[in-house]
């Protein structure tokens, strides 16, 4: 795949996962997970693919497979902070588009990565672009692990929340608080996809921004940018992405998929 515009893909990878230790180095069909993610980023047409990690073992693994790697500090509170360090170290120009490809998503669609980068380029007033897809069932809308996003008329985010937004009052109120009895939403509801493209000038600013109260309450780092006045363009795609790897069960599922592909 050839991207219509240059962008840099950065894959943050940390070993200290509480639910799945050493996750970036987990074997998927003979290669570490982080390498599989980097391969997907390369397929997306990134001008440069970098893995950012505080672990030398991760850097060594990706370099063995021909990818560039950057050693970062171990105390970053988020992947965005890790990207900010990379942008500063490598001196990216203000307009460089940097895509954060999560290190635990080896099945991510390369076309989506490319499209989110292009979406940011098409929205010069926005510092960030991300993606979302429609959801239609009440159990999805009311699931706090599904982050919802409300958009304005131009497809720019108004708010992200774990709560059921927008709230279909006439549909939901008669059944409240019996979530199991809730009908389908009566207006479009979008689930956020955790893929981000940033302008490098914003990444340099991000570590200086104070944490926002809404960010702390929702535990959603993108709300810090919005709290401080930045705009986030949202690309709506019709299809849900492949799930990432958070637990041993997730890892076993994806390992089985890679084994089946090898047959």
From Swiss-Prot:
Broad EC category: transferase
Swiss-Prot/TrEMBL keywords: Cytoplasm, Lipopolysaccharide biosynthesis, Nucleotidyltransferase, Transferase
One Pfam family linked to the record: CTP_transf_3
One cellular-component annotation, GO: cytosol
Source species, domain of life: Bacteria
A GO biological-process term: CMP-keto-3-deoxy-D-manno-octulosonic acid biosynthetic process
Pathway(s) it belongs to: Nucleotide-sugar biosynthesis; CMP-3-deoxy-D-manno-octulosonate biosynthesis; CMP-3-deoxy-D-manno-octulosonate from 3-deoxy-D-manno-octulosonate and CTP: step 1/1; Bacterial outer membrane biogenesis; lipopolysaccharide biosynthesis
Cell compartment(s), UniProt: Cytoplasm
InterPro entries: Cytidylyl_trans (IPR003329), KdsB (IPR004528), Nucleotide-diphossugar_trans (IPR029044)
UniProt catalytic activity: 3-deoxy-alpha-D-manno-oct-2-ulosonate + CTP = CMP-3-deoxy-beta-D-manno-octulosonate + diphosphate
EC number(s) recorded for this UniProt protein: 2.7.7.38
Stretches that traverse the bilayer: none
GO molecular function terms attached to this record: 3-deoxy-manno-octulosonate cytidylyltransferase activity
Family of the protein in this entry: Belongs to the KdsB family.
Stated role: Activates KDO (a required 8-carbon sugar) for incorporation into bacterial lipopolysaccharide in Gram-negative bacteria.
Entry-linked HAMAP family: KdsB (MF_00057)
Record-given protein name: 3-deoxy-manno-octulosonate cytidylyltransferase
UniProt organism field: Burkholderia thailandensis (strain ATCC 700388 / DSM 13276 / CCUG 48851 / CIP 106301 / E264)
Encoding gene per record: kdsB
């Amino acid at each position: 795949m050839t991207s219509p515009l240059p962008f840099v893909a950065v894959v943050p990878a940390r070993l200290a996962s509480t639910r799945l230790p050493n996750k970036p180095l987990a074997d998927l069909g003979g290669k570490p997970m982080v390498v599989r993610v980097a391969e997907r980023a390369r397929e997306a047409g990134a001008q440069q693919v970098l893995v950012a990690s505080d672990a030398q073992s991760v850097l060594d693994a990706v370099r063995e497979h021909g990818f560039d790697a950057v050693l970062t500090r171990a105390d970053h509170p988020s992947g965005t902070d890790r990207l900010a360090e990379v942008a500063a170290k490598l001196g990216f120009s203000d307009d460089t588009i940097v895509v954060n490809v999560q290190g635990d998503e080896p099945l991510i669609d390369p076309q989506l990565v490319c499209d989110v980068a292009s979406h940011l380029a098409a929205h010069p007033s926005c510092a960030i672009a991300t993606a979302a897809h429609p959801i239609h069932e009440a159990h999805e809308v009311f699931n706090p692990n599904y982050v919802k996003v409300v958009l304005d008329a131009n497809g720019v985010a108004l708010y992200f929340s774990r709560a059921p937004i927008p709230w279909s009052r006439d549909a939901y109120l008669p059944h409240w608080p019996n979530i199991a009895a809730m009908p389908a939403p009566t207006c479009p509801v979008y689930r956020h996809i955790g893929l981000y493209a940033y302008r490098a000038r914003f990444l340099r600013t991000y570590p200086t921004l104070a944490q926002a109260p809404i960010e702390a309450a929702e535990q959603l780092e993108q709300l810090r940018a919005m709290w401080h006045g930045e705009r986030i363009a949202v690309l709506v795609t019709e299809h849900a992405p492949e799930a990432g790897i958070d637990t041993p069960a997730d890892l076993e599922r994806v390992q089985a998929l890679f084994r089946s592909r090898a047959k």
